[in-house]
Structure formats: structure tokens, C-alpha cells
């Protein structure tokens, strides 16, 4: 109930123009955006986009101050990365907003949680990460790898959803 729509406008809005889309989406009431990297996020800021932005990919941890100063949230992809980001945020006396990336089947980025019975150690790791200083965790996300395939991907998407839902319940 407290979740907001976050429009993903990475790769120049998938070729449609990220700045144009961000302005239109803001006008329509969208309050959050997601992009691929720091360059895309800063381009939106340089063109007056004020809404919160989440970077889905990797940002060098030594840019913690840039993230914090520009109201940009960072996807946390691993415990090691979280520790590094926390270290730089503390060094720069800032708090970085963050989201947990949960890998429920895409096998690209995030904390592995593809099997409820096997990957339970990831929950403990995420709980540790969320206690790190100078990081403010706002949310968690996953990527459904075949959700656009109506019948063929239905079972896989449902399995991913169950993993995601289970992780949320365990972390709540």
C-alpha cells in the first residue's frame, strides 16, 4: 500500500528520450525513476528532474557523496559492495539511500534468492547489510526474467514472485 510506481527510463528511455519521458511522467504524477548508471542519473538532474532516482547498476563506492548530494539511491548488489559504499559514505559524512537488489532468477545482479529452501543465508546477509552505517535502505527489488512471455514464462515468473514475496516476509 505504501509502494510507489517507479518508471525505468534507462538507456535514454529505451530510445524514447529519458528527459522527455521523465518530464511527462512527473507531470502525470510519477514520483520515482530508475536508470542504469550515475551518468544517466546526473543527466536527469542537470535537466531539472527533481524526483528521486534509483541507479540499478554499479556505481563506484567512492561516489557516495555524489549520490547523497543529488538525492540518488543506489542498488546494493552484494555485501562487499554495501560495506564499501558504507565506508565511503562515512568518510564523506553523508547517508546514501539504497535499495536491495534481490536475484530471484535473472542471475545477473543481487543477493541470490532463487530457492526458498536453499538460499536462506541471503536473508541473514541482507539483514546484516541493512544495519551498516550511513546507508538508508528505502526498498528492495527484483527482475522478472520472462514476465513478458504470457504462457511460456508464467510458471517461472510465479516462482520468482513467490521467492520475492517470501524474502519480503522474512525481512519484515
Kindly give the residue locations of the regions a language model identified.
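Active-site-proximal beta-alpha core segment in soluble small-molecule metabolic enzymes
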Residues: 3-170
